[in-house]
Amino acid sequence: SEGSPENRICTNNCAGYKGCNYNCDTNIASYKSVCEGEFDPKCLR
């Protein structure tokens, strides 16, 4: 797992998709970052 303690990664509904773990912070940039550069609507669940 790549994730600094300062970036808490929350595994949520996206867990089954493409390793789509999203950051606890609701910043779109963070979503894009953890979603492997792909901004996917599933990441917003």
From Swiss-Prot:
Coiled coil: none annotated. Keywords: Disulfide bond, Protease inhibitor, Secreted, Serine protease inhibitor. One of its GO terms (cellular component) is extracellular region. Disulfide bonds join 10-24, 14-35, 20-43. GO terms for molecular function: serine-type endopeptidase inhibitor activity. The record marks 32-33 as: Reactive bond for trypsin. It is found in: Secreted. Belongs to the protease inhibitor I20 (potato type II proteinase inhibitor) family. Inhibits trypsin strongly and chymotrypsin temporarily. This is Proteinase inhibitor IIA.
